[in-house]
């Protein structure tokens, strides 16, 4: 056979492939079954979120954050609210902080449950997704009972949360926390020692720690490579400094280590949720769930019926919104997928001048070519599952 007669084979992976996690299109260059090059094509879910936010008041911008990583919506609202609160220079009441942390941990479990079980499905196990979705359904009901909506909650507010949690809901969350570790143990027994699952994940998609820093990884992708970098510990925000929890880290930086980390993080999240519930019931956990300043937080309905001033505040807030002092601020939270950051620039008006969103999935997807090169075609879906990419936040 003459030189140069061998030609690499190019195939499209997605955007309608079941393992592509939404609307990802990968153009793969294959030499036989070995991946030579991966070219991710993004933008199929682009909605211009950052531009839309510039035309909305600060209150109207909150729902856009639910639609980024729509697997764990409240974690993103959290970053935006913290950024706006930093510009306004306000402190959130303690009860509101506890409720926020409680729901952020629920979001973390929602995300990790989906990721671990679909990663198992990508390599051929069909039972875990069914168990995972059963638990996610219960958590979405908690979202619904707090905010009225299962997914796009829009529950966090600048200055606190929308409304208090009923005592019965807190009890139900506690009951769920007692039962859930058993589900994690069941998944553990099914997958962790499973020969086929290990063959598909061990030593696949290895990322060393220096490489993880170079590519701008965060979250599980960095911790899987051996760095105990968790913003809840290294730069505590809200009341995370009071919480007692461990940051699990991996040794090998492969898909299997990242799976083990997500399993352990679910256990840690349950522990944080239990601590939040205990603190919410304590005497110092009682009190308002939002700021009492009616220039920022709307007054209660009952107050509006009695006081003309409250009615005027309400009208001004919902027509014009509140003005935020000019300045710029970057706030990052430890979202389930990694470091979710909001860079907010205010020009002193009632709308953000610029809101730049730093999505963790974007940095992870750009390294897809680097991580996948030299692996087999079958490993692409395992690596993709382990990067934990959601397209709402990548394309935004």
Swiss-Prot record:
Its subunit composition reads: NDH-1 is composed of 14 different subunits. Subunits NuoB, C, D, E, F, and G constitute the peripheral sector of the complex.
Coiled-coil ranges per the record? none
- What is known about what this protein does? NDH-1 shuttles electrons from NADH, via FMN and iron-sulfur (Fe-S) centers, to quinones in the respiratory chain. The immediate electron acceptor for the enzyme in this species is believed to be ubiquinone. Couples the redox reaction to proton translocation (for every two electrons transferred, four hydrogen ions are translocated across the cytoplasmic membrane), and thus conserves the redox energy in a proton gradient.
Cross-referenced InterPro entries: NADH_Q_OxRdtase_suD (IPR001135), NADH_UbQ_OxRdtase_49kDa_CS (IPR014029), NDH1_su_D/H (IPR022885), NiFe-Hase_large (IPR029014)
Detail the disulphide connectivity of this chain as listed in its UniProt entry.
none
Family the UniProt entry places it in: Belongs to the complex I 49 kDa subunit family.
Query: Which keywords are on file for this protein?
Result: Cell inner membrane, Cell membrane, Membrane, NAD, Quinone, Translocase, Transport, Ubiquinone
Its Gene Ontology cellular component terms are: plasma membrane
Q: Which reaction does it catalyse?
A: a quinone + NADH + 5 H(+)(in) = a quinol + NAD(+) + 4 H(+)(out)
A single Gene Ontology MF term assigned here is: NAD binding
Q: What is this protein called?
A: NADH-quinone oxidoreductase subunit D
Q: Which organism is it from?
A: Rhodopseudomonas palustris (strain BisA53)
């Amino acid at each position: 056979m003459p030189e140069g007669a061998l030609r690499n084979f190019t195939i499209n992976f997605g955007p309608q492939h079941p393992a592509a996690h939404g609307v990802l299109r990968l153009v793969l260059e294959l030499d036989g079954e070995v991946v030579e090059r991966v070219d991710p094509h993004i933008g199929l879910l682009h909605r211009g979120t950052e531009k839309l936010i510039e035309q909305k008041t600060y209150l109207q911008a909150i729902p856009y954050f639910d639609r980024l990583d729509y697997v764990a919506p409240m974690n993103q609202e959290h970053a935006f609210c913290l950024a706006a609160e930093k510009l306004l220079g306000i402190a959130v009441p303690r009860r509101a902080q506890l409720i926020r942390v409680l729901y952020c941990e629920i979001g973390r479990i929602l995300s990790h449950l989906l990721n671990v079980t679909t990663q198992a499905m990508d390599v051929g196990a069909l039972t875990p997704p069914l168990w995972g979705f059963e638990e996610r359904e219960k958590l979405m009901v908690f979202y619904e009972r707090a905010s009225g909506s299962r997914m796009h909650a829009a529950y966090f507010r600048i200055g606190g949360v929308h409304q208090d949690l009923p005592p019965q809901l807190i009890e139900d969350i506690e009951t769920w926390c007692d039962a859930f570790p058993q589900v994690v143990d069941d998944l553990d027994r099914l997958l962790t020692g499973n020969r086929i699952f290990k063959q598909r994940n061990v030593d696949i998609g290895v990322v060393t720690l220096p490489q993880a820093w170079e590519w701008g990884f965060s979250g599980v992708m960095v911790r899987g490579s051996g760095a105990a970098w968790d913003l809840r510990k290294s730069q505590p925000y809200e009341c995370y400094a009071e919480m007692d929890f461990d940051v699990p880290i991996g040794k090998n930086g492969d898909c299997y280590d990242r799976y083990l980390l997500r399993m352990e993080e679910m256990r840690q999240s349950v522990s944080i949720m239990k601590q939040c519930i205990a603190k919410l019931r304590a005497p110092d956990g009682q009190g308002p769930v939002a700021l009492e300043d009616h220039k920022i937080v709307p007054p209660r309905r009952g107050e509006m019926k009695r006081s003309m001033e409250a009615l005027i505040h309400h009208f001004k807030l919902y027509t014009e919104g509140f003005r935020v002092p000019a300045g710029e601020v970057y706030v990052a939270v430890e979202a389930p997928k990694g470091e979710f950051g909001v860079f907010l620039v205010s020009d002193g008006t009632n709308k953000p001048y610029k809101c730049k969103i730093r999505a963790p999935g974007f940095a992870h997807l750009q390294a897809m070519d680097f991580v996948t090169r030299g692996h087999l075609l079958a490993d692409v879906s395992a690596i993709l599952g382990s990067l934990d990419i959601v397209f709402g936040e990548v394309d935004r």
